[in-house]
């Protein structure tokens, strides 16, 4: 049975499941940000444990096929090295899982932080959707909205 699970979860299947798997979390964040569902499943550590498990599985799978992990450190040497790394599907999955996990973490943080300032949940839908698609711009958009509700700029919160 373990062999069947291992052979089922190809890189393409993992990619599909990661993309589909985070959609319920984002739906809860956007539509029900103040619900118990959001507190238990999304703004907690729960989704990050799931994505960490996927990350570890991809690393394990990479190790079994003899992936050269040392080449990952060459990405800091220049754009040509980075583009060479992106030719490998396993590296893309490692990167994509990392990207999805960080964006979901930022989305959860935005929801928790917006509740401290009682920001309208309809207004919060915009930066959350943008964070899902392009994380840093969604975070910037949230900070702009947050300034108006907090009535101050604080770089340390």
What label would you give each PLM region?
Residues 17-37:
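N-terminal signal-anchor/start-transfer transmembrane helix
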Residues 124-148:
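Hydrophobic, aromatic-rich membrane-embedded alpha-helical segments
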